[in-house]
């Protein structure tokens, strides 16, 4: 360097050969030319040329002068920069420049020149590239490490390079830049914050998006220098995160974005930073936590991230934020869960637990995003989500919020279409989600029109996509229908029915619009618009939009024509799509992107457009069924057996024949059905007959060859076919043939002549055919029918027992076990009823005699002849047949009028029959008649007696039916405001007088002032009043009160002079009045109208008589005293409507705030005996709770902990009412001893199960075991006796003398009551004490009130818990109700206490019972949940209560 200085001092500048002096005196062009030659010279020199280095030293110094560094011309500057770069290369490792300021100027100058790299199309680009390459290769900038201002130089260089890099640069440019910058980081002593910022700023999302190449450059640089730069990055984050020094860098606000980017570039850069995030996750600052959660969500969810496995504590800490108090934090966690599920299946287990809690989050948006996350992952790959996660989505289909329900339903639909319909992941995956189709259709039971519309849309787009080719679409529908569960099939049938009904409403509207305008026409149009509106979402807006649409239809003939075509029965699926498209296009407005009017009309068009079924579709469907019949279909591949496919296919065709009859009108279709008709399979032929019945109206005209072939088949089946086929054959003839009289005659005559009791199988078919002919053509065979009924049906069939019945202790057997003779008798009863229904008049008094006959059957328990030949199951069947016949006749006004009150009351008692199935099926008949508004209102009062049913499920179902029938009537009255003349027969509140009258005449109500009997009356009344009083519409509470007051001013219309009966009626009124007063706050208001009492039931009110006396005994009044805590629901969970989803009630532990499950202060004496958990759950229903109430039948695993806690707390409470209980018992015992001295032995048996609660639990259990052993011994002595707690309903006790003579020989239980079935299993063990408490929250207090019953007429305690259908060790001690006494005999007939448990358990949910609830929103989807209900047996451990339920 000294040598350089010496040379420099000479001042002589040596230029390369041919280059003249370069100064400011020459032109720019000349300067450029000379500089190029200098550049060439320096370019060719290398470091070994010592002589040349000395020669050109002064030139090197000259080129670094300000003249060149600040030259205005960029070409000059570029050439000078190239020279300087080569000079640094040649003179390396020393530089010819010694002044730090000069070096700074030079490097700042070179950095500025590098900006020229930006323009890759510039002619000078190669020189700029040469400059970059030179300084990068030589690492020229490393000279600056010694300079004080090195940071400024490096920062300037970095910023320049990051600013010029662009997508025009090749890999070499990129590489040289990285080399240049990395050498500064790796070989320098330090990295300043400014320099670090100049790199990191390119990672900030805003910059990253502006210049992707700069981002890539920074990324490459950081990867290259990871080890060297890591301490400086760590320091930066320490300063910002831990010390809060945000002022040290402008990037402080982007700290979390930078962490994410750096982690993605190289996780080692953040080794010391990540632990700090754990601290930040627990920050008190909501926003800070949110930022950290956003960051970590992305880091954990990134595709190749190993953060969760590498840093488990951070992962666990992050999971904790799923339960953060701040809603946006929880929302963020949930949003990014799908990334973790998709990219890291191993984390699914951890996430499942937290997503479960969040799926019940009070915040709607969070529940919504849980679904989105799970569905997103499932759509990516079904294996990524476990069954538990899918179940969360399933649960949310019943969410309270429509947005959440919609997301869950749509999510499931998309999953189903992808994996089941398109089978993208094979059969196993399709099997895993096979439940989705059923679940989606179950939602059609919901009351919300939005839900129903969405199900219809999902069905048309995802389950059976309407855009599939016809054959493919029908195949899809065929196998879908074959694999749906029963409830889903009913929902689908209901969906088609609703769509068909709406189609007819729109057709009616179009017909009204086409008529000339009149005032009556306008009213009719408005009425029809209202009906249609109810089938659309948001009825308020829907009404306005539909009025507007009606106006459009009046004005626009083209749109009207398209709509007419759409609702025409002959419209094809393709035509329907065109019509919908044309109408929406015409109504649409391009200037109005969101058009609510158009959206509403789209909803309407979607519902009425036949996009699935037309003539071509039916033809394709029948071909598929035929293939299955021929055995050429691939049924097994579709997951169904051939038999299952054929049955389902015909069932499907049968349903479609109701909703789309015209689509069956093709020769090909009818020929295929004719072939089915001739098949041996009864079900196939039966379905074919029903289809002909529904679709055959035009066969005679349009298809004469089908008519000719069909007639002999129908005649043959009517004469000799199975009974159901005979029935449908008669109806087919009625529907198809114009000359039906001739056809009926050809069938009737031979059948009438050949009636033979000796051939019962043939006789059943004959009776069915004749019965239906009599109903359809009553005038054609009047004389022979009357004669036949009188001589043959009554005398030869009903009054004759030919064969002795099979002896059995069962009360019910399956259909195939019923004796043929009994089947004949049942058909004989049905035939008589059909004959009467056909006549529709009682001119011949045949109705009276038939009713007397039916009553005689009920009086005699089904054994009309009283010869004792019939078996118990046969008698049960005949009782049911007789009661059903009366209900059928009551639906015809002319016969309803002649049914006496005594007959009505006896018929009502069948609802409490000893046989479970009789009660169940009779209740269905009542419900069916009421829901169709065919049965008079007094038959709804019969439902009150269901409160006495010992089986919990029956009570629950009865309540559900009652709710539906009340709602049906209220809805009808809303829609038909002008039916005031029918108000008395329709207004549900008018059921109260009938209920009062029925309960006053209840055979169980013997002693007017008996507390226990009045408690039963109270339960029955509240069973009805609870539902009626759930809403106080139009001040109905006051109206009910006024009705009850009016009844007290009248006398019993049945026995007006019977003072005791009148007193009973007034006492029942007082019970009702006390219930109303205790449950209503508005009862005292003035009623808007005066009630009208039914004249048959009550005398006219006596205006001169004011009955203000209170007939209730003082002890009962205390049960209604206001001020005591009282529950608002009778029978607690029993009365809770069944769930549509069969879903278990969610535990509140998943909620942010919790409430107690126990209603410990519940009033034990209130009609609502056992409310408890239901109340607390209902009162605190948050938005995360289900859309429908959950079933009392469903499993309660999540509630078990709460139940056990509840049990403990109940046991620890001081017992109330104990003293009163003891006194009551003593009183009742002494009364019995005075009045019935002969009944002492009974009292001993009657004590069973009534031990005082004060005794210790051990001794109680011991006593219990002793009692059970004694009981078993007694049962072995006399197989099925039961303790005579009360005589059979309606049968007065035999004389005391007779009773004494019977009881003297033994101290065993007298035989007056129903027999008790022998237990199948051993007595209960200690385990019973640990069964969960599902209904009785206040069981102790209830028991105390009940225990003081000692006399033989008292009933054993009613325990809902012991009514579980599957508890096979405990027979249902349900006694038969209300048969008045037969002629006294020396020994009363032995009989069952109730149906054996084995029978009960087999048929708790028959198919017919399910049909009863077809339109109800309360249908359970899980049979498994019903099975789980078997575990819900309640045993009060402290009471030693009898196993049997209270007999009714």
UniProtKB/Swiss-Prot annotation:
Residues 1141-1448 are annotated as: Disordered. Residues 1286-1298, 1374-1386, 1390-1402 bind DNA. This is Sister chromatid cohesion protein PDS5 homolog B-A. HEAT repeats lie at residues 383-419. Belongs to the PDS5 family. GO terms for cellular component: chromatin; nucleus. Residues 1285-1294, 1346-1356, 1389-1399 have a biased composition (Basic residues). Interacts with the cohesin complex.
């Amino acid at each position: 360097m000294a040598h350089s200085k010496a040379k420099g001092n000479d001042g002589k500048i040596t230029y390369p050969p041919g280059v003249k002096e370069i100064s400011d005196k020459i032109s720019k062009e000349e300067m450029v030319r000379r500089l190029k030659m200098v550049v060439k010279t320096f370019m060719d020199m290398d470091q070994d040329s010592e002589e040349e280095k000395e020669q050109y030293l002064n030139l090197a110094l000259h080129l670094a002068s300000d003249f060149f560094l600040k030259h205005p011309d960029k070409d000059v500057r570029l050439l000078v920069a190239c020279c300087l770069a080569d000079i640094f290369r040649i003179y390396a490792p020393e530089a010819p420049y010694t002044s730090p300021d000069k070096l700074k100027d030079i490097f700042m100058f070179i950095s500025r020149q590098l900006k020229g790299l930006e323009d890759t199309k510039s002619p000078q680009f190669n020189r700029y590239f040469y400059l970059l390459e030179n300084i990068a290769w030589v690492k020229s900038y490393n000279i600056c490490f010694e300079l004080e201002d090195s940071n400024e130089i490096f920062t300037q260089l970095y910023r320049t390079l990051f600013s010029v890099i662009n997508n025009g640069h090749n890999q070499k440019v990129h590489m040289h830049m990285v080399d240049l910058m990395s050498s500064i980081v790796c070989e320098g002593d330090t990295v300043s914050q400014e320099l670090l910022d100049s790199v990191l700023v390119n990672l900030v999302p805003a910059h990253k998006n502006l210049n992707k190449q700069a981002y890539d450059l920074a990324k490459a640089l950081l990867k290259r220098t990871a080890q060297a730069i890591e301490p400086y990055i760590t320091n930066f984050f320490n300063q910002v995160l831990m010390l809060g020094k945000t002022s040290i860098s402008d990037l402080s606000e982007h700290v979390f974005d930078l962490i994410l980017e750096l982690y993605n570039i190289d996780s080692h850069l953040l080794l010391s930073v990540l632990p700090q995030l754990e601290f930040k996750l627990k920050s008190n600052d909501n926003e800070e936590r949110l930022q950290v959660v956003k960051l970590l969500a992305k880091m954990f969810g990134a595709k190749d991230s190993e953060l969760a496995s590498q840093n488990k504590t951070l992962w666990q800490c992050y999971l904790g934020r799923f339960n953060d108090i701040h809603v946006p934090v929880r929302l963020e966690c949930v949003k990014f869960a799908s990334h973790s599920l998709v990219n890291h299946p191993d984390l699914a287990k951890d996430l499942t637990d937290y997503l479960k809690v969040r799926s019940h989050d009070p915040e709607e948006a969070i529940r919504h995003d849980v679904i989105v996350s799970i569905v997103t992952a499932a759509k990516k790959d079904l294996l990524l989500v476990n069954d538990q996660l899918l179940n969360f989505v399933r649960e949310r289909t019943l969410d309270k919020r429509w947005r959440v329900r919609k997301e869950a339903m749509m999510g499931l639909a998309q999953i189903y279409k992808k994996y089941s319909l398109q089978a993208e992941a094979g059969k196993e995956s399709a099997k895993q989600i096979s439940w989705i189709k059923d679940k989606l259709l179950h939602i059609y039971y919901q009351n919300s029109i939005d839900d129903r519309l969405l199900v219809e849309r999902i069905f048309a787009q995802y389950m059976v996509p309407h855009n599939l080719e016809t054959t493919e679409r029908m195949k899809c529908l065929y196998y879908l229908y074959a694999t749906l569960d029963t409830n889903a099939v009913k929902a689908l049938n209901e969906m088609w029915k609703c769509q068909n009904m709406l189609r007819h409403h729109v057709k009616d509207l179009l017909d009204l619009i086409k008529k000339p305008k009149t005032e009556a026409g306008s009213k009719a149009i408005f009425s029809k618009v209202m009906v249609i509106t109810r089938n659309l979402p948001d009825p308020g807006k829907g009404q306005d939009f539909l009025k507007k649409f009606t106006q459009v239809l009046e004005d626009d003939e083209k749109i009207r024509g398209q709509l007419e075509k759409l609702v025409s029965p002959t419209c094809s699926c393709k035509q329907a799509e065109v019509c919908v498209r044309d109408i929406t296009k015409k109504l649409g407005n391009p200037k109005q992107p969101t058009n609510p009017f158009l959206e509403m009309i789209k909803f309407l068009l979607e519902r009425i457009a036949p996009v699935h079924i037309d003539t071509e579709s039916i033809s394709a469907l029948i071909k598929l069924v035929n293939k299955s019949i021929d055995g050429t279909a691939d049924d097994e591949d579709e997951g169904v057996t051939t038999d299952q496919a054929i049955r389902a296919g015909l069932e499907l065709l049968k349903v479609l024949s109701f909703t789309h009859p015209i689509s069956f009108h093709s020769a090909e279709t009818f020929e295929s059905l004719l072939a089915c008709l001739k098949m041996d399979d009864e079900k196939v032929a039966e379905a074919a007959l029903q289809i002909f019945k529904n679709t055959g109206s035009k066969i005679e005209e349009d298809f004469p060859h089908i008519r000719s072939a069909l007639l002999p088949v129908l005649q043959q089946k009517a004469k000799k076919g199975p009974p159901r086929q005979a029935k449908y054959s008669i109806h087919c003839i009625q529907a198809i043939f114009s000359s039906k009289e001739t056809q009926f005659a050809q069938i009737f005559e031979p059948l009438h002549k050949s009636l033979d009791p000796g051939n019962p199988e043939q006789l059943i078919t004959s009776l069915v055919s004749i019965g239906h002919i009599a109903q359809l053509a009553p005038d054609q065979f009047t004389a022979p029918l009357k004669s036949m009924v009188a001589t043959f049906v009554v005398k030869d069939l009903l009054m004759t027992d030919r064969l002795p019945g099979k002896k059995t202790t069962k009360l019910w057997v399956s259909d195939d076990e019923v004796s043929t003779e009994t089947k004949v008798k049942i058909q004989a009863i049905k035939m008589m009823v059909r004959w009467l229904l056909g006549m529709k008049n009682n001119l011949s008094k045949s109705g009276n005699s038939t009713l007397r006959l039916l009553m005689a059957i009920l009086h005699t328990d089904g054994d009309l002849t009283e010869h004792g030949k019939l078996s118990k199951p046969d008698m049960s069947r005949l009782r049911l047949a007789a009661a059903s016949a009366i209900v059928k006749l009551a639906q015809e006004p002319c016969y309803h009028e002649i049914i006496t009150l005594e007959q009505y009351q006896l018929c009502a008692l069948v609802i409490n029959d000893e046989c479970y199935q009789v009660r169940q099926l009779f209740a269905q008949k009542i419900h069916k008649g009421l829901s169709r508004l065919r049965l008079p209102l007094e038959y709804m009062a019969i439902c009150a007696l269901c409160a006495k049913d010992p089986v919990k499920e029956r009570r629950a179902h009865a309540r559900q039916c009652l709710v539906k029938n009340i709602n049906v009537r209220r809805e009808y009255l809303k829609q038909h405001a002008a039916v005031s003349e029918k108000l008395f027969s329709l207004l549900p509140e008018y059921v109260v007088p009938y209920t009062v009258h029925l309960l006053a005449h209840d055979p169980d109500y013997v002693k007017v002032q008996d507390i226990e009997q009045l408690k039963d009356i109270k339960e029955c009344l509240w069973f009805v009043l609870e539902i009626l009083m759930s809403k106080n519409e139009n001040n109905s509470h006051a109206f009910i009160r006024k009705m009850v007051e009016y009844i007290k001013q009248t006398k019993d219309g049945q026995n007006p002079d019977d003072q005791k009966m009148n007193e009973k009626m007034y006492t029942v009124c007082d019970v009702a009045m006390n219930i109303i007063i205790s449950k209503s706050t508005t009862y005292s208001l003035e009623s808007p109208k005066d009630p009208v009492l039914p004249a048959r039931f009550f005398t006219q009110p006596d205006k001169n008589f004011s009955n203000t006396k209170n007939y209730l005994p003082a002890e009962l009044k205390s049960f209604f005293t206001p001020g005591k805590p009282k529950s608002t629901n009778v029978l607690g969970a029993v009365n809770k409507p069944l769930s549509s989803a069969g879903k278990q009630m969610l535990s509140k532990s998943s909620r942010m705030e919790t409430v107690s499950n126990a209603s410990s202060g519940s009033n034990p004496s209130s009609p609502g005996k056992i409310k408890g958990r239901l109340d607390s759950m209902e009162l605190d229903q948050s938005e995360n709770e289900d859309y429908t109430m959950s079933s009392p039948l469903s499993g309660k695993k999540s509630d078990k902990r709460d139940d056990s806690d509840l049990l403990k707390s109940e046991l620890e409470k001081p017992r109330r009412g104990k003293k009163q209980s003891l006194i009551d018992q003593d009183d009742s015992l002494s009364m019995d001893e005075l009045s019935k001295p002969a009944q002492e032995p009974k009292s001993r048996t009657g004590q069973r199960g009534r031990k005082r609660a004060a005794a210790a639990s051990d001794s109680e259990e011991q006593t219990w075991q002793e009692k059970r052993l004694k009981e078993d011994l007694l049962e072995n002595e006399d197989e099925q006796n039961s303790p005579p707690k009360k005589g059979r309903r309606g049968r007065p006790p035999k004389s005391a003398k007779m009773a004494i003579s019977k009881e003297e020989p033994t101290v065993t239980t007298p035989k007056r009551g129903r027999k008790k079935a022998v237990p199948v299993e051993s007595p209960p063990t200690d385990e019973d004490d640990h069964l969960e408490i599902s209904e009785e929250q206040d069981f102790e207090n209830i028991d105390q009130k009940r225990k003081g019953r000692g006399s033989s007429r008292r009933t054993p305690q009613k325990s809902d818990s012991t009514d579980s259908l599957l508890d096979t060790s405990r027979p249902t001690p349900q006694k038969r109700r209300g048969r008045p006494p037969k002629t006294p005999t020396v020994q009363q007939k032995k009989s069952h206490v109730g149906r054996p448990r084995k029978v009960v358990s087999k048929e708790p949910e028959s198919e017919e019972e399910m049909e009863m609830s077809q339109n109800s929103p309360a249908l359970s989807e899980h049979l498994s949940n019903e099975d789980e209900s078997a575990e819900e047996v309640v045993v009060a451990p402290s009471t030693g209560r009898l196993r049997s339920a209270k007999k009714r």
